[in-house]
Amino acid sequence: PGGMPGTKNLYASEIVCAAVKQCAADGRLLAAICAAPLIFGRLGLLRGKRATCFPGFEEELDGAEVTGELVTTDGNIITARGAGAAMLFGAAICDKLRGGGGKEILAEMQHPEI
């Protein structure tokens, strides 16, 4: 999740921060949307990586190259700007977990009448 105060509350949790750091150390997939990428930034996980977040939180992405893209994938880290990018964010996660095909899955879910 992202947004406030959710992101602030997640970052305040030692359990959450320890789990995120362990996942990063293990090379597992990390994904955050909206303001939540700032957690990765504050934990030092974005140094030398490309990342995006909700406008106004860019300075919190310590050491990252902020892209401003709707969704940015760099290695095992996926970040997204906000709720408007949620479908693309999900597709990027599917791509990582399935080895591709996320956009095809997204296309199948869309209503042709829209």
Please identify what each model-predicted range represents:
Residues 1-114:
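Active-site-adjacent pocket-lining segments in enzyme domains
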